[in-house]
């Protein structure tokens, strides 16, 4: 059978989006891996699936697969594209929607200026909830990598993140340290790794090594986790502008227990069909 899909991106973090509300199919990890190949498939960082809700209090179910076939809990840039998709496809007439993910319920607000504001919910900072192996919650942790100690912050934005402060994102060892921290045994579900350069109290630069995808042009949950780490440690004040290789996100966070608000664009690139 042929499935309709839409190619989208949020700041260069690119997605294949499939509507399983009006279409019916059983998509498996092998399909994500096959379609995700940039040489022999469609090519994407993540596959986003729009499904009918299982929870009566939400509008849709939102599933995410990495290009390696792994299903993940959350994707912030994908959430903005999800919102743009369901409105453009007239799957809803609402401008504010709730969706359920493996990482919890998030709220999406499609603004008149075309920007999409996402309520990502409060960050999870308790190590067991990230999950991260540590005796107690702390602002930062020391992780041994190749015999060296690496200082990092850890948080979950529905998916696990480590954040390292660096002097320069250009010189940051993203491709050297990223995969080693991603697979570190103290992160039992692997981890996304952000390399954060604080420019001033309202502006930072960020590169992210994404779990199961490698370095991407942008990572929405990574930007949220980086902002939380920077605000908690007193480096920055909310709201903050996070500059990623693909563009800029605005992040607001009022402190522990409060939701992280992310605002940014979502762009439709093309429509297509793929054989299942």
From Swiss-Prot:
Pathway(s) of this molecule: Amino-acid biosynthesis; L-lysine biosynthesis via DAP pathway; DL-2,6-diaminopimelate from LL-2,6-diaminopimelate: step 1/1
Coiled coil (residue ranges): none
Residues of the site described as Important for dimerization: 270
Keyword DNA-binding: no
Catalysed reaction equations from the record: (2S,6S)-2,6-diaminopimelate = meso-2,6-diaminopimelate
Pfam families per UniProt: DAP_epimerase
GO BP: lysine biosynthetic process via diaminopimelate
Residue positions of the active site: 75 (proton donor), 219 (proton acceptor)
Keyword set, alphabetical order: Amino-acid biosynthesis, Cytoplasm, Isomerase, Lysine biosynthesis
Subcellular location: Cytoplasm
Transmembrane regions listed in the UniProt entry: none
Positions of substrate binding: 13, 46, 66, 76-77, 159, 192, 210-211, 220-221
Assembly behavior: Homodimer.
Function: Catalyzes the stereoinversion of LL-2,6-diaminopimelate (L,L-DAP) to meso-diaminopimelate (meso-DAP), a precursor of L-lysine and an essential component of the bacterial peptidoglycan.
Database matches in HAMAP family: DAP_epimerase
Protein known as: Diaminopimelate epimerase
Source organism of this protein record: Stutzerimonas stutzeri (strain A1501)
Lineage summary: Bacteria, Pseudomonadati, Pseudomonadota, Gammaproteobacteria, Pseudomonadales
UniProt gene name: dapF
């Amino acid at each position: 059978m042929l499935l309709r899909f839409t190619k989208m991106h949020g700041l260069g973090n690119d997605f294949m989006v499939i509507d399983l509300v009006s279409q019916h199919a059983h998509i498996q990890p092998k399909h994500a891996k096959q379609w995700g190949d940039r040489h022999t498939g469609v090519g994407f960082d993540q596959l986003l699936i729009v499904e009918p809700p299982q929870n009566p209090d939400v509008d849709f179910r939102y599933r995410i697969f990495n290009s390696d076939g792994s299903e993940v809990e959350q994707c912030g840039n994908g959430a903005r594209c999800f919102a743009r998709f369901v409105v453009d496809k007239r799957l809803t007439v609402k401008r504010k929607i709730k969706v359920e993910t493996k990482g919890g319920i998030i709220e999406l607000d499609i603004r008149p200026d075309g920007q999409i504001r996402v309520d990502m919910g409060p960050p999870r900072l308790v190590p067991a909830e990230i999950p991260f192996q540590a005796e107690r919650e702390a602002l930062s942790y020391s992780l041994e990598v190749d015999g060296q100690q690496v200082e990092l912050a850890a948080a979950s934005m529905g998916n696990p993140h480590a954040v390292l402060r660096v002097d320069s994102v250009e010189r940051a060892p993203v491709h050297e340290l990223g995969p080693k921290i991603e697979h570190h045994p103290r992160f039992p579900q692997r981890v996304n790794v952000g390399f954060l350069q604080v420019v001033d109290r309202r502006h930072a630069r960020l590169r992210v090594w994404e779990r199961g995808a490698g370095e991407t042009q942008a990572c929405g949950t990574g930007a949220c986790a980086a902002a939380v780490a920077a605000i908690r440690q007193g480096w920055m004040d909310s709201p903050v502008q996070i500059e990623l290789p693909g563009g800029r996100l605005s992040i607001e966070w009022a402190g522990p227990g409060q939701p992280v608000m992310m605002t940014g664009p979502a762009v439709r690139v093309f429509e297509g069909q793929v054989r299942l």
